[in-house]
């Protein structure tokens, strides 16, 4: 009888764990979402310190079409700011230069007619 009772207790514990598992998944997803939002706010705060309003506006507009490029640039700017390598604020002109340096060079193809 003890074995049967032990099996029942084990099965009951498994069922209770399965029922609480969706709650744990939802809670973990919520925590990840909160952590991501906090990181985004920290990045925005750093960018406010190192960029002029015009440059931030350009970056915001560019995010709509080139999200990966903007995220890469933001991470580099945050890293430079944290290391103290930015002496002046990034203005719109400096941002344009940085963006052109980050974009891969396109091949020029020319068609010649014979």
Swiss-Prot record:
GO terms for molecular function: DNA binding. Keywords: DNA-binding. Gene3D superfamilies: PDCD5-like (1.10.8.140). GO terms for cellular component: cytosol. The keyword Metal-binding does not apply. It comes from the Archaea. Coiled coil: none annotated. Residues 16-35 have a biased composition (Low complexity). The keyword Transmembrane helix does not apply. NCBIfam families: PRK04239.1 (NF003268). PANTHER family: PROGRAMMED CELL DEATH PROTEIN 5. Belongs to the PDCD5 family. This is DNA-binding protein Mbur_0117.
